[in-house]
């Protein structure tokens, strides 16, 4: 049976009217009733579990009690140190097998693990490398010696350089460090948000020359869909800037060409894997751009959605909120679709900040004013009661990416993540992984673990997991009839999962 779409506003029995105030012992019956009523409000609190699901839920509860009483509790530790502990967890292993629905917040440059980029892509012919003045790297595929440019004066053929160095394993490991944030000493290497964001953005730039090479991009997208499916994910909405794709001879393709390639790869992957439901693109631009540039990007997104209505889901603005321009700064550009009488759905990053009361902190309200379809991260939403109320009434889901929020130093102990408030109130939520390759993850299982065990705590149950997974289809950009089809497909996978785990 497919879960029905939750109502925008849920009316609860006002039990407080019936609670007697007493100086003596409170009524145990009233206490039990209040506890049950509060539990019914949480994410998954309205989900009725079958007997088989109840059995699995009891097993999960016992496992969670054991993990919460252990000497080291993974959600309280930086993910880079907690990862080995998580991978030993029986809960995590079960979550890997669980059908998780859709990944709705992943950036295209971080879809595939860096080991594949280094061990596969950089070993391909005609791959050049340059070491920059700011201790980063650039890559370029070319059929001739690349010309020097302002940030790269000397390009070296990687094949030749590896031979000279004589330690390919050590060299490859050093290359991986340029493409990921993962480190054994995260607190030492990243003492504050500025430092970690600087490395974060450098890694994006470093990977670009590899990923945007046309033959690599085709393989990369197929590989990325495969990694998601391996983690029991059936649908993807990928944020992409549609960077210019290039050929070995320097030919550069436009965005239409890149979208068509994405379409071809997705079609082939679905043909090879019929139980994968599909993928769409959310076109994204960096908030460091000027108003005129964003205007042009919005117009381009409108045209691309017109040409590819089944593939282009909408538009977003990316980049660090704290140092970037606000949504309100771009109000003229973001109002263009309405002025032109067209619909361009927005999927705004908003509230990825702990700077309460600043102009950046108002992005949450502005995202809702611009009628965003979902809120990316929404870390600060719990501090905005009106925005929280509006998003709930409008069924605007928050894309919760717990590992990203921890690694980028918004929160250290995930038990203190403000999404705990949202989960306790049953706020519309989906779980996603933001930039998996940057954090040393793949798919959604790691983030589901952190949300289920850390943020949700002991009260989060199988009903919570079931609702979060189903939410990812409900709150996708798919049209209503495809949501119904997707939910039916997901429900069959869920039922098989329950049957396989009695």
List each language-model region with its residue ranges.
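Metal-cofactor-binding active-site regions of metalloenzymes
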Residues: 2-5, 17-502
